[in-house]
């Protein structure tokens, strides 16, 4: 980590803390998205390389088949191409140019694909899903996409509709809590849902799963690594027989990768090196707050910068999210909050209002850490450093990466600011920085003119579409 004046605070945290960690007393219900180990726009790619590992039944990676420059080279149906161009996709991103020739090949083969946040993973698997559909069976479910949250499922549903807007006869439906009536049947060709709801609908025979062709898991590592979601994904997989299983995520920790390979056997694999996982367009910074209470005071000082574009504040606990939202609202600021205790319809409304700019600041838990794409987001604040599970003992690099990936999407520039206030939070952030080999910029809370200049420079470069390095 480095200060804005290029000095390092590494000496301050080089020695491991000898203080004893106090046992966490957090109530499970207060924490969203904690992991319990189980055992559209024009894309501008950054400087990273995609490693392709082909399964035994695949051909030679050096063949022209495995590298394309245009969507037309892939033989994609004209109606899908029209949808891509309408969404302003000009040419395949790196993940798309490597993945799509393999995804669209016949016979269909499985894939485990990893790429940075905001590089076009969703479009890659949506193109695949649309290309596999048999339109002579318009009321037969043929593709199933699972996501860890209702918000992400709704977003993927929207991407399917957008890319498929010119595909005649396409039907898409969300299978999330509250979206399907008790005795109603789900007859859409493409179903996007959360694992528990989909499992229940298949068990009740509300979904005819007999002719499914494709099963896709978005944010696959997160779902396979959580006890509940992992079990549900396995149950859903056991209920259907498909030709192709696709696992997509920005991260695949080593402890999850073996499970992913079992879930999607004999898969082609696309991976990134660990130090290439962070998006270069996200300028990662941190602030040394005086204490836990002082974090809120720093947050209030940052508010003017947060509303230049729009911002997401990530906290660990639901009550923290609600408390911050209440305080900021009482002080006259227009903010919104969303977490797992909200009813589904209310969560949908809050997120849509944020997308439309009715609130410029959203306070949330890890329920929105993954996959959510709101193009106007120029800043992410880690009010609480992400920790694994429900403990305060081990930092969570993967969640950190997904959180900050809510900005800097599709080649844009964004800012992430992490709050630290004691040895434990310093050490946690330092471990995350070492994990990804990144150098964080320290913002000086004693010189707000300098801090504002640094942050504004990045945010305004993003809004102007320039490729500025802070």
From Swiss-Prot:
GO annotation, biological process: poly(A)+ mRNA export from nucleus; protein transport; translational termination; tRNA export from nucleus
Coiled coil: none
Molecular-function GO terms, alphabetical: ATP binding; ATP hydrolysis activity; inositol hexakisphosphate binding; mRNA binding; RNA helicase activity
EC primary class: hydrolase
Residues spanned by motif Q motif: 69-97
Catalytic activity: ATP + H2O = ADP + phosphate + H(+)
SUPFAM superfamilies: P-loop containing nucleoside triphosphate hydrolases (SSF52540)
Protein name according to UniProt: ATP-dependent RNA helicase dbp5
């Amino acid at each position: 980590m480095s200060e804005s004046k290029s000095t390092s605070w590494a000496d301050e945290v080089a020695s491991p803390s000898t203080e004893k960690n106090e046992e966490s007393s957090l109530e499970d219900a207060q924490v969203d998205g904690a992991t319990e180990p189980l055992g559209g726009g024009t894309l501008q790619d950054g400087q990273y390389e995609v490693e392709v590992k082909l399964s035994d039944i695949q051909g030679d990676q050096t063949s022209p088949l495995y590298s394309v420059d245009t969507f037309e080279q892939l033989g994609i149906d004209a109606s899908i191409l029209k949808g891509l161009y309408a969404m302003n996709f000009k040419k395949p991103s790196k993940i798309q140019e490597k993945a799509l020739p393999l995804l669209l090949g016949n016979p269909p083969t499985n894939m485990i694909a990893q790429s940075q946040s905001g590089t076009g993973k969703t479009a890659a698997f949506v193109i695949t899903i649309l290309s596999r559909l048999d339109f002579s069976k318009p009321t037969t479910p043929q593709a199933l996409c699972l996501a860890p949250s209702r918000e992400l499922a709704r977003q993927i549903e929207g991407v399917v509709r957008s890319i498929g807007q010119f595909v005649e006869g396409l039907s898409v439906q969300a299978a999330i809590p509250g979206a399907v009536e008790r005795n109603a049947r789900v007859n859409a060709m493409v179903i996007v849902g959360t694992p528990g709801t989909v499992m229940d609908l298949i068990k009740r025979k509300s979904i005819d799963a007999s002719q499914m062709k494709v099963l896709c898991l978005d944010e696959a590592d997160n779902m396979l690594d959580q006890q509940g979601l992992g079990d549900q994904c396995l149950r859903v997989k056991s209920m259907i027989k498909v030709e192709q299983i696709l696992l997509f995520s920005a991260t695949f920790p080593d402890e999850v990768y073996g499970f992913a390979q079992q879930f999607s056997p004999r898969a082609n694999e696309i991976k990134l090196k660990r130090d290439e996982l962070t998006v270069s367009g996200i300028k990662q910074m941190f602030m040394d707050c005086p204490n836990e209470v002082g974090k809120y005071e720093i947050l209030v000082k940052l508010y003017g910068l947060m509303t230049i574009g729009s911002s997401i504040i990530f906290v660990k606990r639901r009550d923290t999210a609600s408390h911050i939202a209440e305080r900021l609202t009482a002080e006259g600021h227009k903010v919104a909050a969303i977490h797992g205790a909200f009813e589904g319809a209310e969560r949908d409304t809050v997120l849509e209002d944020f997308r439309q700019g009715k609130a410029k600041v959203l306070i949330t838990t890890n329920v929105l850490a993954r996959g959510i794409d709101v193009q106007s987001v120029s800043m992410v604040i880690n009010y609480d450093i992400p920790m694994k599970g429900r403990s305060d003992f081990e930092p969570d690099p993967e969640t950190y990466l997904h959180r900050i990936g809510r900005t800097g999407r599709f080649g844009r520039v964004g800012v992430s600011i992490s709050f630290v206030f004691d040895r434990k939070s310093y050490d946690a952030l330092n471990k995350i920085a070492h994990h990804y080999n990144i150098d964080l910029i320290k913002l000086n809370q004693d010189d707000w003119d300098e801090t504002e200049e640094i942050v504004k420079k990045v945010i305004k470069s993003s809004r102007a579409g320039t490729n500025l390095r802070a």
